[in-house]
């Protein structure tokens, strides 16, 4: 009699590739050999690429939800994170999700593919203005978290910064002496985090620039130029975990939407090239008050899938049941998709990985 353990590797791979990412842990428990196999090989990655789907995570009803996007619409894959506290922010790096909990004391690092969870307790209670980012040391792949704490006074300067080290399981203060303000829009790439930043010096212009936190050197790099002169209305994303992408568009002052991607990117240097420029005047139904948020690009089809932030900050569950994603491409291609109104105005693009770390129990 044939058992689950007798199935060929190819057939097991086909079965596992059809399982939603957040359900893999439950499926692994059904067969020891399946569990071993899936912890040494990523299934489903080729299928995502073949179907031109984008996998991402967001927060809905204070739960982490996985979503799949393609040019036909959006699908909610379900949620396997229900019993691990209420979450209000999620950040992706290296196949790991850094989840910030609503109790303002605990962080959770989660590998959805492997099902590993690590609870981390903050050194002191944090507020909604505190920003957390995840990265790693490029010399030894040791993962770290940086926390930048803000107190919104007349200067709006960061008050302190701390780093959590996975190897030592401890926090320590770091000196950064900032004269800039970091926007919440940030992206992880090759172990480092790239932020939009703005000078706070009285005689400085307020134009945005790019700023990288290097997790290997544990310091911020120099100001990196953006490809457009922008004071707002710019959003970051990444392409295949290899390049940064930038979306610029303000239809109150401009008639086009621009997507730029990096030719070169490291903590100390960047160069850009235009990927897509769309004239939005002919697009019937394009909103006048469009406020671009998280986005994904399809390099082959030259389209962008972008989340409209307009009204999110002023919405409640009573007056906002749905928000919209817009799919925009060359030659006037334009359509929209409704999505349930989320707690977080951002999506974290996700790429599965086999990164492992020492799991911990619930952090009290």
From Swiss-Prot:
SMART domains: FBOX. Gene3D superfamilies: 1.20.1280.50. It comes from the Eukaryota. Residues 2-49 form the F-box domain. This is F-box protein At1g59680. It comes from Arabidopsis thaliana.
């Amino acid at each position: 009699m044939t058992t689950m353990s007798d199935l060929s590797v190819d057939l097991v791979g086909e079965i596992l590739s059809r399982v939603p990412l957040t359900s893999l842990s439950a499926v692994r428990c059904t067969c020891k050999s399946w569990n071993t196999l899936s912890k040494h090989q990523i299934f489903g990655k080729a299928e995502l690429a073949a179907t031109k789907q984008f996998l991402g995570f967001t927060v809905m009803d204070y739960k982490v939800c996985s979503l799949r996007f393609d040019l036909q619409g959006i699908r909610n894959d379900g949620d396997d994170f229900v019993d691990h506290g209420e979450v209000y922010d999620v950040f992706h790096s290296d196949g790991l999700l850094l989840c910030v909990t609503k109790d303002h004391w605990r962080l959770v690092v989660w590998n959805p593919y492997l099902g590993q969870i690590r609870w981390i307790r903050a050194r002191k209670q944090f507020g909604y203005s505190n920003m957390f980012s995840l990265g790693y040391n490029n010399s030894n792949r040791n993962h770290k978290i940086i926390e930048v704490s803000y107190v919104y006074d007349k200067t709006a300067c960061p008050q302190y910064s701390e780093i959590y080290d996975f190897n030592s399981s401890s926090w320590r203060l770091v000196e950064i002496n900032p004269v800039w303000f970091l926007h919440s829009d940030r992206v992880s790439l090759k172990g480092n985090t790239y932020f939009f930043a703005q000078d706070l010096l009285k005689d400085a212009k307020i134009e945005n620039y790019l700023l990288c936190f290097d997790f290997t050197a544990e310091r911020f790099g120099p100001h990196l130029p953006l490809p457009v002169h922008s004071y707002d209305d710019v959003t970051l994303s990444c392409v295949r975990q290899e390049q940064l992408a930038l979306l610029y568009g303000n239809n109150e002052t401009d008639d086009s939407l621009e997507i730029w991607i990096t030719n070169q990117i490291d903590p100390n240097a960047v160069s850009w090239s235009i990927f897509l420029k769309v004239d939005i005047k002919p697009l019937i139904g394009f909103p006048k008050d469009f406020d671009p948020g998280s986005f994904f690009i399809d390099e082959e089809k030259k389209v962008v899938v972008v989340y409209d932030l307009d009204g999110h900050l002023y919405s409640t569950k009573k007056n906002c049941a749905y928000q919209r994603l817009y799919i925009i491409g060359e030659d006037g291609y334009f359509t929209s998709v409704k999505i349930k109104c989320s707690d977080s105005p951002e999506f974290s693009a996700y790429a599965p990985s086999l990164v492992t770390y020492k799991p911990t129990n619930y952090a009290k």
